[in-house]
């Protein structure tokens, strides 16, 4: 999925859209995406000027956005909620771990796997890698919410 397709599903926009491209997915199973980390990201002005590092919470947010995309594509494949305007909200995080810093010039590879959906709560295994090395992981949860026009 190109950035244009990503933007059809996610409501996020600059500076908070943290998925640049979806490289692979299988509805109901997994989604892989990338985030190109540029020195031009606004958060690098203050985190940290001497040695810029992507904040861990933004790595988790990028993974959360990937979970929303997988939820949308899964519902779409099941032909569910087609006539509703839906938004997936980040509702939980467990076992978050940060193993390495992410710096300008890195390409963050995101992978989320659907574990289960119980009472409207989607649970995912989430990992972020740079050059094949694990930089962050967590179990993330999201929930769908119908948007009223």
Curated annotation (Swiss-Prot):
| Pfam families reported in the protein's UniProt record | FabA (PF07977)
The alphabetical list of record keywords is:
Cytoplasm, Lipid A biosynthesis, Lipid biosynthesis, Lipid metabolism, Lyase
Name by which UniProt lists this protein: 3-hydroxyacyl-[acyl-carrier-protein] dehydratase FabZ
Q: Where in the cell is it found?
A: Cytoplasm
What is the top-level taxon of the source organism?
A: Bacteria
Q: E.C. number, please?
A: 4.2.1.59
- Organism listed in the record: Thioalkalivibrio sulfidiphilus (strain HL-EbGR7)
Biological function: Involved in unsaturated fatty acids biosynthesis. Catalyzes the dehydration of short chain beta-hydroxyacyl-ACPs and long chain saturated and unsaturated beta-hydroxyacyl-ACPs.
């Amino acid at each position: 999925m190109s950035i244009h397709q990503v933007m059809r599903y996610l409501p996020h926009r600059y500076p908070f859209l943290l998925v640049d491209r979806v490289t692979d997915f299988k509805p109901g199973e997994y989604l892989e995406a990338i985030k190109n980390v540029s020195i031009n990201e606004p958060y690098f002005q203050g985190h940290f000027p001497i040695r810029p590092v992507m904040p861990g919470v933004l790595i988790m947010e990028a993974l959360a956005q990937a979970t929303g995309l997988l939820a949308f594509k899964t519902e779409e494949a099941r032909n569910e909620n087609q006539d509703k305007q839906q938004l997936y909200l980040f509702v939980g995080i467990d076992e978050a771990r940060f193993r390495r810093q992410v710096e300008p010039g890195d390409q963050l590879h995101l992978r989320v796997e659907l574990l289960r959906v119980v009472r409207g709560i989607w649970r995912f295994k989430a990992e972020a890698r740079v050059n094949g090395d694990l930089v962050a992981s967590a179990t993330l949860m999201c929930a769908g919410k119908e948007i009223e026009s």
